[in-house]
Amino acid sequence: MSNSSFHNKRRDFVKQSSMLAGAIAAAPIISRANFFSGSDDVIKVAVIGCGGRGTGAAVQALSSKQNVKIVAMADAFRDRLDDCYKNVSAELANQGAGAKGSIDVPEERKFVGFDAYLKAIPLADVVILATPPGFRPIHFEEAVKQGKHIFMEKPVATDPAGVQRVLAAAKIAKQKKLNVVVGLQRHYQDSYRALFAKKDIIGDITSMQAWWNNDGVWVRPRKAGQTEMEYQMRNWYYFVWLCGDHITEQHIHNLDVINWFKGGYPVKAQGFGGRQVRKSKEHGEIFDHHYVEYHYADGSILNSQCRHMPGTSSKVDELFVGTKGKIHCDAGRITDLHGKTLFQYDKSKERNPYQTEHDELFAAIAKGEYKFADAENGAYSTMTSILGRMATYSGQIIDWDKAINSGLDLHPSVYAFDAAAPVNPGPDGFYPVAVPGVTKY
């Protein structure tokens, strides 16, 4: 990757954040009575982003045992919207007469294009934000401005500029008492909640490990006639402005657990990474492996690794080592330092956390309760992953404060399929890729 491809776009964030907060705050604080008057009323939902995760979240919303109705859908691509509508409708039909949720999205409430979210959000009480994460900040801002409750998928940004926008909007969401749940579902997973409640058993946490190692994800090949912007939008996982690299899009789950149990965020990071296996033209500009050493304010260190390499061993887990014991997260177990079990969660009792997060969100909305304010933590855990990416791309020690205030903005100035993409391939068809020791931040 050339330096110019990932340069810092310096912005006056004090001015920008103040203007943004003022604009969002200027929108009226919507009372419960204005948009939802009681437990027997329909809770109207708009789905923004109709890919796999948007489809899954829509089904989970409809399965929440509340009177939920999907009334609008929005996506950049018509075929993705149509697939989502078909699949959600089929799942609802499979639930049979016992289904309480419903879908009512006629043609006039199916919106396509980069601006589709602006047309769908006003029609709903709750919005599901499930586009590629590069769009999350602008969609979250708009939903907060319009006074909507929100479920938004992780990560909530792909660069520090986006993190700043989410943090500014999160403050306004709290003022408006808008419930916001972020899809870091381990916070809603029974075994993790039980481990968190008993974490003091291991004494002071001195070190941590986190893994997301597996084969990787899909590839969507370039098709004839696609503009560069359309191709990147279709194959979004492999472009940093849209995905954030897999350390951000996927490994954020593990990093978030570490932050949660630690009760704080890292102060600096250093690491390494690269592309050894996944390095064809269709693999864009992201790495296939990252290793990051995160330092926390109390001196404890997290050793973090994520890898996308077919045929290698798989592991998705977190481990905490304390002065008196260890927490083995995936196993739901706490042991002493010699391996003796001190606590074991009964995994047979575990509910589906993807469903639980929707059950709890929609139950709160149905009761007129303000219970969830996940956006700030979602932004800071997103920034944790971005900090690691900045360290692996550059090969340098990256300070948290400098990184989050860097002004790094990877996004295009214009969103349109015929607009210039933020990064372009060279004459050989390959995209520029970060080079540790050369790439600067």
Describe the residue ranges of each PLM region.
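N-terminal secretory signal peptides and thylakoid transit peptides that target proteins
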Residues: 2-21
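C-terminal helical cap and adjacent loop that interface with cofactors, partners, or active-site loops
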Residues: 17, 22, 56, 249, ...
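N-terminal glycine-rich "phosphate-gripper" loop used for MgATP/nucleotide binding
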Residues: 131-134
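Predominantly a Rossmann-like dinucleotide-binding segment in NAD(P)-dependent oxidoreductases
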Residues: 49-53, 174-182, 186-284, 310-312, ...
